[in-house]
Amino acid sequence: DFAVGLSRQLHGLTMHSERPGHRMYEQYHPLGVVGIISAFNFPVAVWCWNTALAWICGDVCIWKPSEKTPLCGVACQNIWAEVAKENDLPEGISCLVNGDFTVGEFLTQDERIPLVSATGSTRMGRIVGQKVASRFGKSLLELGGNNAIIVSDKADLKITIIGALFGAVGTCGQRCTSTRRLIIHDSIYEEVTSKLANAY
């Protein structure tokens, strides 16, 4: 939905100039090829989020899924191929390359790929960001976080315990938005920790 909404907003801007009889305007142009490196968790969602935005902006995508989820990549690519064929879209709008980290390195170093979007660990993001920056490319990095929940003395503890527990262990904790720590008001600390321990 966000990508479809964005498609109606890619019209550029026209501005007045301080020079009489002149106007300034900006235009949006496709980058060309977007490289997508996704992690093992949420492989389909991450691919969809990235490709939808790239396609709306007129770009084509090369997707390198995690070596732990290659079949997700193959399945998505097959579904996309059917959709593209049914709608008379040319081949090559979406490409798939499976392999280990060396395949990702090729994407980060290839100057024909102006933008690389990578989802994964902070360590991986640091490597990808530096390699892409060294060739003056652009990178979008969604990396592992250290997310906190702040629990005030006025918090609804029933909802807080459910949210904290699900945030920490939902999907086995294998997501970048997992709750890693709680910041609890002193006056309710004992009550919250006791309820949380019992919830486990």
What are these regions (language model features)?
Residues 42, 68-71, 101-103, 122-123, ...:
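Short alpha-helical
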Residues 48-104:
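PLP-dependent aminotransferase-like
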Residues 6, 37, 100, 119, ...:
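Conserved residues at the C-terminal ends of beta-strands
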Residues 23-24, 95-114:
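A structured beta-alpha segment of the ubiquitous adenosine-cofactor-binding alpha/beta core
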Residues 82, 109, 115, 123-200:
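ALDH superfamily catalytic-core signature
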Residues 28, 45-48, 70, 74, ...:
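Glycine-rich phosphate-binding loop at the start of an alpha helix
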